[in-house]
Structures are given as C-alpha cells and as structure tokens.
C-alpha cells in the first residue's frame, strides 16, 4: 500500500488554497415592496441608474424609470404576474440593449429583439443601446438625395429626402399604413434598408403587413419590430427606440435606412399609462410633462450624417460615404383634429407632414392626400431634376382648382378660361389617384406629369384619365425601355429627353386605344 508523503499533502493543500478564488462581485440588491399593472416598486436599490436593467427572480427583467428617495419604480419587460412582494431584485449595471445588424433583415422581432416569426434564433453579432443621443449639429449634412415613395402625389408635391422626418397624419382608415407599406415596397432597387415598427396594432393586422411584404419581395431588406395591442405598455413604449437602434446600425456605417413608426399616438398612450401608474403628475390630456421629449429624442435620431461621422464611427473602415436614417412617423387623429396635444407636438418636431383626409378617401381619391396643408420643409432640394422641373405646376393647378371649384358652386355661367382651368384641375386630381402596392418609378411619374402639363390629356374624358395613364406607362415601358431606364438611373432632364417623351406620347395617342 502506497503511503502519502506529508510534505506532498501540505504542498497539495497549499496549491488548492492558492487556486481558491475569493473575489466577490458586489451586487446591489433590493426587495420588491409593491407589484401592480406591470409596475414594481423596489426598496433598497440605492445605486440604480435611470433606464438600468433590473433583474428579478425567474430570469425576468425590468427597467428603472423612477428614482425616488427611498425606492425605485421600475416597469416589467414581460409577464409581471410571476412577481410577488418580498422577492429580490438586483441591479445589473447595464442599460437595455437590442441585437443589430444585417442578420435581422427579413425577420419579425419583439421590442427586445427576440424573434417572434418562428424562423429560429437570430445570430446577430452585435448589440446596441436602445436609448442613444442623436448625432450633433456638426456631424449632420443637409438633405439632398431623394427617397422615392412611389406615390405620384407625394414625390411630385411633398418630396421626401434621405435623412428627413416626414409625418403621415390622418384619421383612422384613411390609408396611412398603406402609404407606409408602399414606401417600403418602392425601395426594392434603391438599396435602402427598411424597419417597420408596429405599435399597439392587432396581431392579425401585423401578420397581414408581413405577408404583403413577403409577397412583394420587400421582406428581404426589411425588419419588422412588433409590439402588439396585447403586449405590455412597456413593450409598446420601447418598440420605436428599439427599431431606431436597428436602423441606426446602417446609418452609422454609411448606408441609407428608412424607418416607419406605426403609430406614435399609441406609443404616447402607452407612455401615459406607464407614467400614471408610476404616479407621475399628469398634464394636458393626462399626458405626462415630458411627452414632447418622448417623441423629440426619438425623431432627432433620424438624420443624414456626414462622411466624417461615418469614418470616425467605423474607425476608418468606411470612407467617403454619408449615412442616413429617414423616418416616416404616423399619427392618428380623432375626427380630423390636428390641434390635439400629440399631433401638434409631432408636427413641430418633423420636417413636414402628409395630411390624409377622410372626405377625400370616401370620395375615391386615394391616396387621400390634402395637398393644401401637406408640406415638405426640406425635401424640395432632394428631388430629382426631372421631377422638380416637371412637377412645379401640379400643386398650383390643384390649389387653383379647389378655389375655383368652391367659387363655381355659386356661379351659373363661367368664362372659357375658368372652365378650362377647372377641367385641368379635375384631370390632375384624377391623375394623382393610384392603386395600392403599385409604386411608380421616377420615369413613370415623369411621363405622366409631362403628358398632363403639355395638354395631352385635355381631350381625354375625366373618368378615363386613370386608364389612359396606366396604358401610357405600359406603352413607354415596352416601347421606350432604354429611355425609361436612363431617366430612372440619372434623373436628368434635357431637350433630348423632353423630345423623346413628347414623341413617345404622340406615338401612343396616334396608335393606341385606351
């Protein structure tokens, strides 16, 4: 039998003692003293930061929103029903982060970046903070490149540029979501990555949107962030910030991204609910005092950043490229009241608004854009040359038509010039009508608007304008494909292009039926 040497035993014991890790990680721990409606009040978390992740028993997390003298108010990110008074809560020392990167394209995720489309886990290499400071004035660049929405009425009269914030506002059932989805579909060949944030919508509605994006092939360059109506208010509050962080990944690397918030009215309602449960003092319409800041800090993150910013952010990996994040926030009004609290806030934050009207929608004018009060404050400098040159008279024609139409109701006999102006206005109104999921390219719009401006539609019946326009575009796409391709790629307008368009329209009118 082998005997152990006492010196060996002592050496072994010394080695074990030397290897023993006695370091301790100090965790700030508190006790839950109240749980109600997704809000917990925790006693004893002295070192909690605002917005810090709080860990509860059972792997559940919360977010610290109220830092009071003797307690912390936190909102639970998930099902709060498993939490009880007396359970422990721990600080994590981290703020909320979500996965970012190209791996999220084509996927549907919740407000925390977890996949909810049944297609397995997302192998994202990077995460980023949900709440970030927007780029400063020095790092920004003016908006001078277009985002084609595919809508004639928008691209000609209310153009949107890369890095712009353009509000889509209107009552329920006026086509706000349809316009946003069409804007995503129109980016098929533009290289713009898209993020669609659904806030407080029915799950069936979100499923329909995803299905339509898949059918049109748009899901390949789109991420859908969904916080449905059944999700906790905290998720609906966080979803826009999460989506914005996912979009910023592309902006900061010299690419272009488009984000749609559908809609921010429901986010404001969710935030009001959280604030009231946290016992914050209510203000106008029971919203908390910082509801303006809720939206301004979100929408300020949409911007066009300079090549220097991109180069600095990527440590020189990407040079000579500007990045942009374009935002199309949606606001739902009640009975057309644009002077309510949240609509006026968002109107003042954004760079213009597209106002959709119920009366126009019901009259069959779709998209139901009211060109009179819709405006784009910075998009004009981002329009392509050909659209800018040709679309100048469209808004004027519609404004004059509306004025004359109101006057003509009381006048029995009209002079020839007034009658012609009225008829031209009617034709332009018809021309702006468009089917859903059928975006017009730059060339398509150029041909349509040129035909209208030069009087080629004057002899076409008003009710046949839509059919005439569709037939004209189809003719140009088949017979003048190289010209259309040139216009789409360059956006230039010169005498040769004008002559070619003119010849094409005359040839169409001489040889085709419509």
Curated annotation (Swiss-Prot):
Site positions for Required for activity: 374
HAMAP family documented for this protein: ATP_synth_alpha_bact
Gene Ontology cellular component annotations, sorted alphabetically: plasma membrane; proton-transporting ATP synthase complex
Positions with a binding annotation for ATP: 170-177
GO molecular function, one term: ADP binding
Reaction catalyzed: ATP + H2O + 4 H(+)(in) = ADP + phosphate + 5 H(+)(out)
Record carries keyword rRNA-binding: no
Pfam families, alphabetized: ATP-synt_ab, ATP-synt_ab_C, ATP-synt_ab_N
Subunit structure: F-type ATPases have 2 components, CF(1) - the catalytic core - and CF(0) - the membrane proton channel. CF(1) has five subunits: alpha(3), beta(3), gamma(1), delta(1), epsilon(1). CF(0) has three main subunits: a(1), b(2) and c(9-12). The alpha and beta chains form an alternating ring which encloses part of the gamma chain. CF(1) is attached to CF(0) by a central stalk formed by the gamma and epsilon chains, while a peripheral stalk is formed by the delta and b chains.
Descriptive protein name: ATP synthase subunit alpha
EC number(s) reported in the record: 7.1.2.2
Native source species: Acinetobacter baumannii (strain ATCC 17978 / DSM 105126 / CIP 53.77 / LMG 1025 / NCDC KC755 / 5377)
Subcellular location: Cell inner membrane
Signal sequence extent: none
Family of the protein in this entry: Belongs to the ATPase alpha/beta chains family.
Membrane topology value: Peripheral membrane protein
Known role: Produces ATP from ADP in the presence of a proton gradient across the membrane. The alpha chain is a regulatory subunit.
Keywords: ATP synthesis, ATP-binding, Cell inner membrane, Cell membrane, CF(1), Hydrogen ion transport, Ion transport, Membrane, Nucleotide-binding, Translocase, Transport
